[in-house]
Curated annotation (Swiss-Prot):
Keywords carried by this UniProt record: Cytoplasm, Protein biosynthesis
GO MF, one example: ribosomal large subunit binding
Subcellular location: Cytoplasm
Descriptive protein name: Ribosome-recycling factor
Family of the protein in this entry: Belongs to the RRF family.
Record Pfam families: RRF (PF01765)
Keyword Cytoplasm among UniProt keywords: yes
Amino acid sequence: MKMEIHKNLEEKMNKTINALKDELASIRAGRANPAMLDRIVVEYYGSPTPIKQIAAITAPEPRIISIQPYDGSALSSIEKAILQSDLGVNPSNDGKLIRIIVPQLTEERRKELTKVAKKTSEDAKVVLRNERRNANDRLKKMQKDNEITEDELKTAQDEVQKITDKFIKMVDELTEKKEKDIMEV
């Protein structure tokens, strides 16, 4: 049962790390990155649809994103959705595809994005700590129900802490990497 709690904890923490990776990928650095558009939802035939489901998104050059809709009629809807997003970019529509030129980031904007990355990682750490607390609560309940001894409880809690420390370190590494990426000119 203890091992099941540890395994369950690792699975939940892995999901948190994967969600953090997705969040950090969507924070724009100085280069064009198709993941910047992942959160954009386009009104397509009356229903909100993620942009990556209705168009091929590529970065043919370091500062250009190219969006080629699978259905040409979606071009104006995609352009409208990009303009309404908080990306701060102006799409250019040539009738077949949309190009976005990603402007250089100002020092001030870089610092803002770094703060966003830090907040995102802090939120992930809170989730990890909550998972640690839940695992420890389950272990304490097992000890209270005489399923494990006090020594086993202490050993299991130490293992929970080691797992948590490992994932917190991953969060810190991912954040540090993203901050370097953002601050790179």
